[in-house]
């Protein structure tokens, strides 16, 4: 799910310029169950933050709650005030599930909104 400000022209131009400078994040972790490599949240932030900042785009991540789930969101906010947001619901039943789900959601929403 995605939400945006009414206007996106300045953000779109800045985001396109930032994306042109971004490289793929380093696959610095291994999933022990599937033996696959992935980029953790820190690697993704290290990859996208310099280019976004250079082009006047801030990253804000947080959570909202609904019954039985947490909504993780990542919002890119341009210096003009224009913004785009990606939201990801995380069902949970235990605090450990919630904590890992929030990290998972932050990683995936940041990747999605910057791609």
Please give the residue ranges for each predicted region.
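Polyanion-binding surfaces on beta-sheet-dominated domains and ring/shell assemblies
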Residues: 1-115
């Amino acid at each position: 799910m995605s939400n945006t400000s009414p206007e996106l022209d300045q953000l779109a131009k800045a985001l396109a310029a930032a994306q042109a400078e971004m490289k793929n994040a380093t696959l610095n972790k291994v999933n022990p169950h599937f033996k696959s490599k992935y980029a953790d949240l820190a690697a993704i932030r290290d990859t996208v933050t310099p280019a976004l900042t250079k082009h006047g785009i801030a990253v804000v991540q947080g959570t909202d709650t609904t019954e039985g789930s947490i909504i993780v969101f990542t919002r890119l906010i341009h210096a003009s005030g224009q913004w785009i947001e990606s939201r990801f619901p995380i069902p949970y039943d235990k605090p450990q599930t919630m904590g890992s789900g929030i990290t998972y959601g932050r990683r995936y929403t940041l990747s999605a909104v910057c791609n």
